[in-house]
C-alpha cells in the first residue's frame, strides 16, 4: 500500500479517527459544549422535562429506585441537571454517564462514568444527539447510477471508491436508495446497530433517542454530512479540529429494534416540540396581568417562556425527532 493510498479512507473510518482517535475532537477537555449548544445547554427546562419523564417511567415500573442512563453524556451536564431537578422528589436515581471521553473533574460523585451502557438497567436510557456522531460511511451514485463509497483525504478532498456491497448495499436499497447520478446518502447501518445494542441493555423502562433526523420520504438528496467548530457550521474535514455529524435515519433505527418505523405500541417517533409539550414545556407567554401582581415572577416566567420557545421552535430544536422504545420486563436482557 502506497502513502498516497493510505491518505484515502472511507468516511466511517476517517470520522472515527477524527472524533475518537488520539487527540480526537470529542476527547478534548472543552467537550462538545465548547463548540455548539444542544438542548441540554440551551435551557435547564430540558433537564427538568427529562426528570419528569424519568418520574413517569418510575411510576410505570412501580418503583422509587430508577436508573438513568445518559448515552453520549458529553461532560455529564444532563445528568447533573436531572439530579438537581429530582432532589426532594422521593426518587432514588442511579445515574450512569456513557461516554468515551474521560470523566470530567467536579462531576457529581453519584454519577457512574462508563464507556458502555450497564446491562439490566431498569428505568430510562436517554441519548441526546448521540446517534448523529456514530460514524457512518457515505455513498454517492456515479455517472451510471452505481452507488459507491465516498473516500476522503485528511484535508477533506473526496473521491469515489468501490461499489457499495453487502449489508451496506442492502441497507441503502431498503432505506435510502440512490437512483440519480450525484445523489448521496449516509449509510446508517452502524447507527441502527448502536441503537439496538443500547436498547438491549434495558431490562425494563424506556429508551429515547433525540436527534436531528429524517425519515423515508424526506431524505436529503445529497446527504447531510457537515462540520461544526466554535459554534459555526464548517466544511467536514476529518482532521480532529471539528465535529463531524450528519442527520439520522431514525425510522431505520426504530426498525432495528423490531418495532415499526414509526408509531406502534412499543415504538414512537414524534417531534421534540410534541414530546416536550407533553412534559409541560410549551413556550407559552405568562399572562400580562402577572406583571402588575408579581413583577419579579413575571420576568422569571417570561425568561422561562423564551427558553421553552427555543427548545420547541419550528425550524430549530423543536423539529428534532424523539424516538421512544418501551421495554417490558419480558423483552429485556
Explain the meaning of each model-derived region:
Residues 1-116, 121, 139, 274, ...:
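Rossmann-like AdoMet
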Residues 11-17, 127, 214-218:
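Hydrophobic/aromatic-rich, well-ordered segments within soluble, folded domains that form packed cores
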Residues 18, 125, 253:
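A residue-level signal for conserved active-site and pocket-lining positions in enzyme catalytic cores
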Residues 69, 98, 125-128, 210:
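Active-site flanking residues adjacent to catalytic metal/cofactor-binding acidic residues
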Residues 73-78, 132, 214-215:
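Gly/Ser/Thr-rich loops at beta-strand to alpha-helix junctions
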Residues 119-142, 185-189, 193, 201-208:
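A short SAM/SAH-binding and catalytic strip from SAM-dependent methyltransferases
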Residues 124-176, 222-230:
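A mobile, often basic/glycine-rich helix-loop segment
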Residues 169-333:
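Long, Lys/Arg- and hydrophobic-enriched amphipathic alpha-helices
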Amino acid at each position: 500500500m502506497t502513502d498516497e493510498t493510505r491518505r484515502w479512507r472511507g468516511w466511517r473510518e476517517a470520522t472515527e479517527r477524527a472524533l475518537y482517535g488520539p487527540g480526537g475532537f470529542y476527547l478534548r477537555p472543552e467537550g462538545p459544549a465548547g463548540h455548539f449548544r444542544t438542548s441540554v445547554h440551551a435551557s435547564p427546562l430540558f433537564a427538568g422535562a427529562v426528570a419528569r419523564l424519568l418520574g413517569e417511567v418510575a411510576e410505570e415500573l412501580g418503583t422509587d429506585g430508577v436508573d438513568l442512563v445518559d448515552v453520549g453524556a458529553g461532560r455529564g451536564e444532563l445528568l447533573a441537571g436531572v439530579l438537581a431537578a429530582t432532589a426532594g422528589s422521593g426518587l432514588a436515581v442511579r445515574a450512569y454517564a456513557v461516554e468515551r471521553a474521560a470523566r470530567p473533574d467536579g462531576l457529581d460523585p453519584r454519577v457512574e462514568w462508563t464507556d458502555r451502557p450497564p446491562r439490566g438497567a431498569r428505568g430510562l436510557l436517554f441519548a441526546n444527539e448521540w446517534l448523529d456522531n456514530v460514524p457512518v460511511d457515505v455513498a454517492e451514485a456515479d455517472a451510471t447510477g452505481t452507488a459507491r463509497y465516498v473516500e476522503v483525504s485528511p484535508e477533506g478532498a473526496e473521491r469515489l471508491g468501490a461499489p457499495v456491497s453487502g449489508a451496506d448495499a442492502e441497507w441503502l436499497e431498503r432505506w435510502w436508495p440512490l437512483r440519480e447520478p450525484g445523489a448521496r446518502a449516509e449509510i446508517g447501518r452502524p447507527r441502527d446497530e448502536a441503537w439496538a445494542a443500547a436498547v438491549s441493555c434495558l431490562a425494563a423502562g424506556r429508551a429515547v433517542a433525540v436527534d436531528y433526523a429524517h425519515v423515508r420520504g424526506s431524505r436529503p438528496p445529497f446527504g447531510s454530512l457537515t462540520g461544526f467548530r466554535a459554534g459555526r457550521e464548517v466544511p467536514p474535514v476529518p482532521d480532529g479540529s471539528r465535529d463531524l455529524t450528519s442527520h439520522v435515519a431514525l425510522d431505520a433505527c426504530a426498525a432495528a429494534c423490531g418495532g415499526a418505523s414509526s408509531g406502534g405500541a412499543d415504538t414512537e417517533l414524534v417531534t421534540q416540540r410534541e414530546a416536550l409539550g407533553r412534559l409541560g414545556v410549551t413556550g407559552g407567554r405568562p399572562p400580562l396581568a402577572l406583571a402588575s401582581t408579581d413583577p419579579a415572577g413575571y420576568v422569571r416566567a417570561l425568561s422561562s417562556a423564551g427558553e421553552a420557545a427555543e427548545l420547541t421552535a419550528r425550524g430549530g430544536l423543536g423539529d428534532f425527532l424523539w424516538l421512544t422504545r418501551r421495554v417490558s420486563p419480558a423483552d429485556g436482557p
